[in-house]
Swiss-Prot record:
The entry's keywords: Cell membrane, Membrane, Transmembrane, Transmembrane helix
Disulfide bond sites: none
Topology Extracellular: residue spans: 43-48, 99-121
Protein name, as recorded: CASP-like protein 0U2
Superkingdom of origin organism: Eukaryota
Upper taxonomic lineage: Eukaryota, Viridiplantae, Streptophyta, Chlorokybophyceae, Chlorokybales
Length: 171
């Protein structure tokens, strides 16, 4: 009888214990909090960029986490490295935009855009944590790129007979 639904999926539960998965999950949480805290502040264009960037990165992280859990083949480390460097650069821009906009004076010289508002400041803090997460992911990808694992460390098949030596004593 065929199996349908979630039981038919072969999830890679070992992926949960890898540092890359954990840092990607932290990146997922930080991007979720960054855009959701800033979503109600649409009167400033800089805040709109933070929301859009956070939404895009949250969606990509969600997709990548599911990809890892569903036994997707690993991406090339050089691709991961440069993607994380680019995303980290955009996270730095979000951090600068959110911080500078919150600190900008409006009206009276003493009144700041975010005076009395905690959500944009918290969003800037999560943008910093997101930047740190992308730095960690870039480091992990760079380390894999520069020191690739040996071919023997890859499990090519789950079949124990396939793992037998090529030469045999059977005649």
């Amino acid at each position: 009888m065929p199996v349908f639904g979630l039981a038919a999926l072969k999830l890679n539960w070992e992926a949960l214990s890898t540092p890359k998965f954990r840092v990607t999950f932290a990146q997922w949480v930080c991007s979720l909090l960054m855009w959701s805290l800033m979503a109600s502040y649409s009167k400033h264009g800089e805040f709109k960029f933070v929301v859009v960037f956070g939404l895009v990165m949250w969606g990509l992280a969600s997709t990548y986490l599911v990809y890892q859990l569903l036994n997707g083949p690993p991406l090339a480390p050089i691709v991961e490295f440069w993607a994380n460097v680019a995303a980290g650069s955009l996270a730095f821009i979000c951090l600068v935009l959110a911080s500078a906009t919150c600190n900008r004076a409006v009206g009276e010289p003493q009144t700041k855009v975010c005076s009395g508002e905690l959500k944009p400041k918290a969003s800037a803090a999560f943008a910093f944590l997101l930047l740190c997460a992308y730095g960690g992911l870039a480091y992990l990808s760079w380390r894999t790129w520069r020191n690739p694992p040996t071919i023997a460390s890859y499990a090519l098949h789950d079949d124990p007979e396939f793992a037998q030596p090529l030469h045999s004593s059977h005649k």
